[in-house]
Amino acid sequence: MAVIVSDLTYVRVGTKWHYVCLFVDLFNREIIGCSAGANKTAELVYQALVSIRGNLNDIQMFHTDRGKEFDNKLISKALETFGIQRSLSMKGCPYDNAVAEAMFKVFKTEFANGAHFFTLEKLALELDDYVHWFNNIRIHGTLGYLTPVEFKQQTL
């Protein structure tokens, strides 16, 4: 869990847009933290950060785009508390956060597109199920056709 990346995307809940924040371990592409909420805020990012199971002191770097949800006092204080260095993409360069962008392409294709979430609670429940499936069952070509959890177990 040395380097983690994150981003946000939107998902339809009822008739409104809600947001999902994912934290991905760059080493094995495992989704290690997530949150869902009605607003695209620093609190949503913070909720995803505190959902990470494991020692946050093991994280050396946190990379994101330059969105205000990531670059603010709340997140800065949390990162400082655990000695995590922040890395921000260059302005106007989404390729700097390519792993997170690719993750959300997969997420939208496999999870969000065509899904009907009538409540935020239903979204959160199905998001937890998806994360479990993604980490423990779904194989990844970049990981030698192992799941993220299998890859971590075999290499550490």
Which residues are covered by each model-predicted region?
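Charged DNA-binding/catalytic regions of mobile-element recombinases
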Residues: 1-156
